[in-house]
Amino acid sequence: MKKPRVCVVGAGVIGLSTAVRIQNELPNYDVTVLADRFSPDTTSDGSGGFWQPHLVGGDNQDMVIQWGRDTLNYLFYLATSPLANRLGAQMVSGYSFFSEPQCPEWRHLVLGYREVDSREIKLLFPRARFGMFYTTVMIHVKAYLSWLMSRFKHNNGNVIDARIDKLEDLVKEYDVIVNCTGLGARKLINDHDVTPIRGQVTRVKAPWVKLFMTYQGTHGHCENYILPGADAVVLGGTGQEGNWNTGVDDEDRKMILEGCVEMMPSLKEAEVVRHWTGLRPHRTSGVRLETERLAKGKLVVHNYGHGGAGVTLHWGCAGQVVREIRTAFTPNFSRL
């Protein structure tokens, strides 16, 4: 019997995790990853690797919670497994502060969620009017991408370094196409609902920082955050929709450092390791995860538009892609 062929387009955390999960759950499929950018040059590489739904739009928030739950459970597994050291996966506890009361739907997914009292706010960040404490997971995304690629190749996955102009170029060679191109979908399939949300972060050496701290003001974006990663503390950040600038902006750098030092004064003398900027793939209408019919009856499964929640949703979305493929294609291939 001929093996059905799958091509996953895109090699960030969404693309690689999707390819690996297809291999895991559909072992009779031949899987290829095709991309023109690989780690360490993907947007995912600069991510803080922090699990929390962030800058993800749309009305399908029930699915965001479902995908987020599946991903968080998987990350908790990695953080408590022997793989934790290799992946920089760790459970982290800390505070999220706000300028007004919040009731996030994801509060039931994290561990130990509680609203903080006025004493904690006054002691830690008096400018805030509301706060919460909880435990979540962080992962070193560069290490994670390397591990995913190793797993993919070990499972006989094919890797092609190339750029395509349209998905239809792949229909002759592949039975299933999975579109994980992120911001690239704007040009590749003419989806102008995909827009960049520019993110800039600074990484510093601050091994004394053990708790994360975030602050969200009235603009609706996380104005500043401090995330204690495995190799550095990540300071952020920006959420500039429609900004295509991939250079490090000095004003943003100043805002990040000053804002984070206000939250945690001990960072004032921390050594700066590097600055980074990336463009998050945001869709106002929400994550696009659905199938579409192409020429000759071939189907593409779209999986893009995760905004600032790529790490937060990746494994759950990969599982949804597998379900889409299994439902749409298994009956057809039984006749080959």
Model feature map: region roles:
Residues 49-128:
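Dinucleotide-binding Rossmann-like beta1-alpha1 core, especially the glycine-rich loop
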Residues 23-45:
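Glycine-rich FAD pyrophosphate-binding loop
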Residues 147, 270-336:
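C-terminal catalytic lobe of FAD-dependent flavoproteins
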Residues 121-176, 180, 185, 315:
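Helical element adjacent to the flavin cofactor pocket in flavoenzyme catalytic cores
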Residues 2-14:
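Beta1/beta-strand and adjacent pyrophosphate-binding region of the FAD-binding site
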Residues 59-71, 131-147, 247-252, 312-313:
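Short beta-strand to alpha-helix junction loop
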Residues 17, 171-258, 262-271:
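Flavin-dependent oxidoreductases
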Residues 87-92, 159, 265-278:
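A short coil-to-beta-strand element that immediately follows conserved catalytic motifs
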